[in-house]
């Protein structure tokens, strides 16, 4: 089975994340997309929701998509989440699967800052999702996937903007739990 990993803080998950997963399932030779929420990320500050809340929001957002799953491996690893460690554990824990990693333009640009980025490029294939008209500089050996991207970020949503870019079930959960207020 070929699995595409979509990693991120998903704080909260929004329609842009789902669009990447849907596009990957349509355009790439993959069987499933696994959403991999970071337990603790080294390159972002200001995380608002707990790991459990973020996982629950992902489950609500992907409900009904049988080829999308949540993978909580980074919680099992504990501590700061580094992609190199996650990839090595995935390969060890699921030796019969083949993995690739899905990232957006923002992460592709920051990729040289990732821990062991050169080794990581040897471990797994990366697919960068970008607007078809945008020319971005990405590391060698990365595959570009053009798509219609939504203009939204989780940070904007945490600030109370663009709430319409949340799946309804996630928006209801945020309201019920009083997250990001």
PLM-predicted stretches and their roles:
Residues 1-181:
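Nucleotidyltransferase catalytic core that binds NTPs
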């Amino acid at each position: 089975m070929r699995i595409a990993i979509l990693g991120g803080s998903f704080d909260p998950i929004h329609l842009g994340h789902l669009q990447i997963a849907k596009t990957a399932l349509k355009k790439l030779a993959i069987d499933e997309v696994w959403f991999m929420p970071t337990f603790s990320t080294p390159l972002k500050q200001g995380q608002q929701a707990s790991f459990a809340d973020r996982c629950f929001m992902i489950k609500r957002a992907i409900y009904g998509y049988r080829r999308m799953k949540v993978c909580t491996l980074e919680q099992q690893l504990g501590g700061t989440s580094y992609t190199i460690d996650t990839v090595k554990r995935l390969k060890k824990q699921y030796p019969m699967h083949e993995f690739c990693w899905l990232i957006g333009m923002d992460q592709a640009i920051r990729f040289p800052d990732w821990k062991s980025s050169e080794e990581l490029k040897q471990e797994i294939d990366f697919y960068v999702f970008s607007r078809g008209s945008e020319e971005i500089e990405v590391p060698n050996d990365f595959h570009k996937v053009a798509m219609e991207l939504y203009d939204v970020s989780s940070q904007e949503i945490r600030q109370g903007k663009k709430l319409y870019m949340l799946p309804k079930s996630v928006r209801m959960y945020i309201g019920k739990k009083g997250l990001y207020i």
